[in-house]
Amino acid sequence: MQTFTMVLEEIWTSLFMWFFYALIPCLLTDEVAILPAPQNLSVLSTNMKHLLMWSPVIAPGETVYYSVEYQGEYESLYTSHIWIPSSWCSLTEGPECDVTDDITATVPYNLRVRATLGSQTSAWSILKHPFNRNSTILTRPGMEITKDGFHLVIELEDLGPQFEFLVAYWRREPGAEEHVKMVRSGGIPVHLETMEPGAAYCVKAQTFVKAIGRYSAFSQTECVEVQGEAIPLVLALFAFVGFMLILVVVPLFVWKMGRLLQYSCCPVVVLPDTLKITNSPQKLISCRREEVDACATAVMSPEELLRAWIS
C-alpha cells in the first residue's frame, strides 16, 4: 500500500512538472502563444524593393493572418521596447510583406512577424540579422534603342524615383570616342546623338542609386545602323542651283509686286493733245504778249466794221 502511494505521488509530481514547464513559454510572452510562430524569416531585396518573407503557419481549414513590425536604428538603440507596425502588413494573409515604404533610411532595421488565428496569437519571430537597404541587388537596366530618322534614341525601364541611369554610347569604328550621358529618369525617350548615314552606333547603360551610392553592372551592348549613303553630288548641285534661283526670283518677284501695287494705287492718266504743251513756257508767254499788242494797236472804223459784217 505504501508503495502504491509513492507511485501515485511520483505520477502527480511528474504531471505537475510537465504542466509547469509547458506553461513557462506562455508566461514569458506578451500574450498567450497558442499558434506556432512563423519561421525562416528572410528579406528579398531587388532594385530597392524590399520583401520580408517567412514560412506559413499551417492551420487546416483556417485562415491565418500575419502582422509585421519593425525598428529603425534609433528605436533599436534607445527605445528597444518600441516596435512600429508596418504600413501595409497588419493582419495580412500571405506569408510575405512589402516593407519598402517602411525602410526609408540606409541604416540597420529589425523586423519581426507573428501569426493570428481568431483569438489565438503566436509569439513574435524576429529576423536573425538586421536588414540594411544598401545590400539590395541592383540588376542591369532594361533599355530599348531606336532610331528616329538620323536621331539615336534610348528609352530605359522605369525603376522608380530613386534611380538614375548612366548611358555610354559611341560610333562603332576603331578608335571611336565613348560619350557618357546621365539620364535622370526612365520610361521616356531620350535623344543621344545625331547619326551619320551608313554608320553604326552602340549603347550600354547602368543604374545608379544616390541613396546608397551604388551602381549596377552595365547592360548588354546594343547597336543600330543607319542605312544609306552620303548625299550625292548631283543632289547637292541641285540644292545649290535651287538656292541661287530663290535668291534671284524672290527679289524680282518683290520688285514686280511693288510695281503692280504702284500702278493700281496711282494709275498714269494720258493727257489729251489739246492739253499737251509742245513749246516752252517762255515762248508761249512771248507769243501771247505779241497778240495782245497787235490787238491793242489795230483799231477799225465803224464803216469798216459794217462792211466786214455784211460781207
Swiss-Prot record:
Cysteine disulfide links: C89-C97, C202-C223
Keyword annotations: Disulfide bond, Glycoprotein, Membrane, Receptor, Repeat, Signal, Transmembrane, Transmembrane helix
Source species, domain of life: Eukaryota
Annotated TM spans: 234-254
GO cellular component, one term: plasma membrane
Topological domain ranges for the Cytoplasmic compartment: 255-311
Tissue-specificity statement: Widely expressed with highest levels in skin and testis. Highly expressed in psoriatic skin.
Function: The IL20RA/IL20RB dimer is a receptor for IL19, IL20 and IL24. The IL22RA1/IL20RB dimer is a receptor for IL20 and IL24.
Subunit structure as annotated in this protein's UniProt entry: Heterodimer with IL20RA and heterodimer with IL22RA1.
Similarity comment: Belongs to the type II cytokine receptor family.
PANTHER family hit by this protein: INTERFERON/INTERLEUKIN RECEPTOR, INTERLEUKIN-20 RECEPTOR SUBUNIT BETA
Name of the protein in question: Interleukin-20 receptor subunit beta
Gene (UniProt): IL20RB
